[in-house]
Amino acid sequence: MENAVRDLALKHALINAVKFNGKADVKAVVSKIFADNPELRGNAKQVVEVVKEVVNYVNSLTLDEQRRILEEKWPEALGARRTVEEKRGDIESLPELPDADKLSKLTFRFAPNPDFYLHLGSARPAIVNYAYKLKYANKGKDSRFILRFEDTDPRIKRPLLDAYDAIREDLRWLGVKWDEEYIQSDRMSIYYEYARKLIENGGAYVVAKGSGCEPDDWKRLKIEGKPCLTREAESSRNLELFDKMLEGAFNEGEAIVAVKTDLSSPDPSIRDWVAFRVIDAHKYPHPRVGDKYIVWPTYNFAVAIDDHLMGITHVLRAQEHRVNTVKQYYVFKAFGWEQPYTIHFGRLKIEGLKLSKSILKKLNLTKDDVTLPTLAGLRNRGITPEAIWSLILFVGIKETDATISLKNLYAYNRRVIEPLANRYMFVKNPVKLRLRGVGDLIEAKIPMHPSYPERGIRVIKITGEGGYANVYVQASDVKPGLVVRLMGLGNVKVINVSGNEAEADFIGQSVEDARRSEAPIVQWAPPDAVNAEVIIPVNVGQVTVDNGLAEPAVAKLEQGTVMQFIRYGFVKLMGSSNGKLRLVYIHD
């Protein structure tokens, strides 16, 4: 028996740990084991001891190790494989990419800047690029998907140290698996090497204080479409200036490396754009490499070099990168490299929801706040990866901007969780309903899920005393003279309502009688109901709260359980505090 219990404990401890950021809870694991294997309750003491031992072991592992073991032993628990398999049809229907059939190998990439956490908008390039990798892999093509952290701006777009792991966690949750991973701040020597090569072949030059081409003059001349002195200088002179940059001879703002482009371009930003700049490493240390470097490549230079060296064949990204694609062209041209095929898709806008990274950062909320459109926030709220995949693949890679409602996401999510979520009763703004004419005992048999009778029922017993019994109902459900059916319990006729109390006659348990009188069916809570509050996200950083009573069975559920409160909506159990259950509203 011990080996079987140990396996169960390991499985559920890993699931619990992965769900709650690497830390499993003994009580939650024990509850899950007993719920699935009630025959083990007779050996409760031994089971608890085994679980404690296993939980200690699991909690000593890193989150990555926990995920790896869970994926190896119980891959279905992560849901990632199911997500991808269910979306196979949508993936196959994606439009073909240019020359994909002619190339022997296809390589895609997702390249986030770890200056913030992934949100619904940034999930789009991750899912789209990975979906194309799968599309062609399913056809037998050699296809790769690369995760690349673009973190070479410690000054303006300063990386967050915890964002690297947070992004990895979000991608795994989405079911996105990468074949290779790179971090640009680990590749500085490579960028320096190619900067020298570009300067040597005349494709770049240095603008520096005291060089005959002052930075302020260079900016003015560029706007005028005129060259600066060092633009035509010998490469040896520019290499000398570049070495001085690396040695720390120039302060921030005193030297840059510029890529030669077209000074007559109608877009001034394309004219001789900055490839490297000096950043004060003591004032702006990089969170990963500290003050090791003072000369940092700009986004477009590092991306162009990496896309070539990593063999990227197709780039799928947002319309806002169109100018960047043009800028990067000049690096590819200078080296004689072939630029990847680039497909630009429109912006994804969610009605009434802020997806701007700069706006979200200013709110100073935790990344998993249930009001945020971050993937961590959506996951915490109860949105599934399957729903996000459905939404992103529905929008596709159209060039036009797409504006959708959150209702679209909720509709996709409802399809996923409706068959999984068992039904429970919750009474908002409760009033005590005193029933007259009841026997010593009445029972309600409530199905766990009306569409899945094999899940069974739960029995709620109400004890009568002297012909009376008490239950709780929603204040708006009772009016004098109204006949209602208390779900699964019986039919009552409301006699009077006064403040927080009401009185009704118990008139039988016949379902047929209720139908004939067209009695509305209402949810209710027994006398031993538990206090509960439901947090309802209204907008980013804003919530309202519904207080009420939940049936006792809800208190026995594992934290994180998604359920449907009858006549209310889908909710997720977040925990409890001071004897009150805390849940978050997902959607109706």
Curated annotation (Swiss-Prot):
GO terms for molecular function: ATP binding; glutamate-tRNA ligase activity. Its EC number is 6.1.1.17. It catalyses: tRNA(Glu) + L-glutamate + ATP = L-glutamyl-tRNA(Glu) + AMP + diphosphate. GO terms for biological process: amide biosynthetic process; glutamyl-tRNA aminoacylation. InterPro entries: Gln/Glu-tRNA_Ligase (IPR050132), Glu-tRNA-synth_arc/euk (IPR004526), Glu/Gln-tRNA-synth (IPR000924), Glu/Gln-tRNA-synth_Ib_cat-dom (IPR020058), Glu/Gln-tRNA-synth_Ib_codon-bd (IPR020059), Rbsml_bL25/Gln-tRNA_synth_N (IPR020056), Ribosomal_bL25/Gln-tRNA_synth (IPR011035), Rossmann-like_a/b/a_fold (IPR014729). Its main location: cytoplasm. Pfam families: tRNA-synt_1c, tRNA-synt_1c_C, tRNA-synt_1c_C2. It comes from the Archaea. Keywords: Aminoacyl-tRNA synthetase, ATP-binding, Cytoplasm, Ligase, Nucleotide-binding, Protein biosynthesis. GO terms for cellular component: cytosol. Catalyzes the attachment of glutamate to tRNA(Glu) in a two-step reaction: glutamate is first activated by ATP to form Glu-AMP and then transferred to the acceptor end of tRNA(Glu). Belongs to the class-I aminoacyl-tRNA synthetase family. Glutamate--tRNA ligase type 2 subfamily. This is Glutamate--tRNA ligase. It comes from Caldivirga maquilingensis (strain ATCC 700844 / DSM 13496 / JCM 10307 / IC-167).
